[in-house]
Amino acid sequence: SCVDFQTKCKKDSDCCGKLECSSRWKWCVYPSPF
């Protein structure tokens, strides 16, 4: 299973879909467009 937006995570693969695990916040975020 995976975790959704703004849910605590340890690595990118913890997050659903294209979400990434933010190293700053330690939760899943949408990838930066930049």
Swiss-Prot record:
Which tissues is it found in, per the record? Expressed by the venom gland.
Q: Which UniProt keywords apply?
A: Disulfide bond, Knottin, Neurotoxin, Secreted, Toxin
User: What do the Gene Ontology cellular component annotations say?
Assistant: extracellular region
Superkingdom to which the source organism belongs: Eukaryota
**PROSITE patterns per the UniProt record, alphabetical:** HWTX_1 (PS60021)
Disulphide bridges, residue numbers: 2-16, 9-21, 15-28
Primary residence: secreted
State the Pfam families in the record.
Toxin_12
Localization recorded for this chain is: Secreted
Listed GO molecular functions?
ion channel inhibitor activity; toxin activity
Q: Which family does it belong to?
A: Belongs to the neurotoxin 10 (Hwtx-1) family. 03 (BsTX5) subfamily.
The entry's free-text remark on domains says: The presence of a 'disulfide through disulfide knot' structurally defines this protein as a knottin.
Q: What is this protein called?
A: U2-theraphotoxin-Bs1a
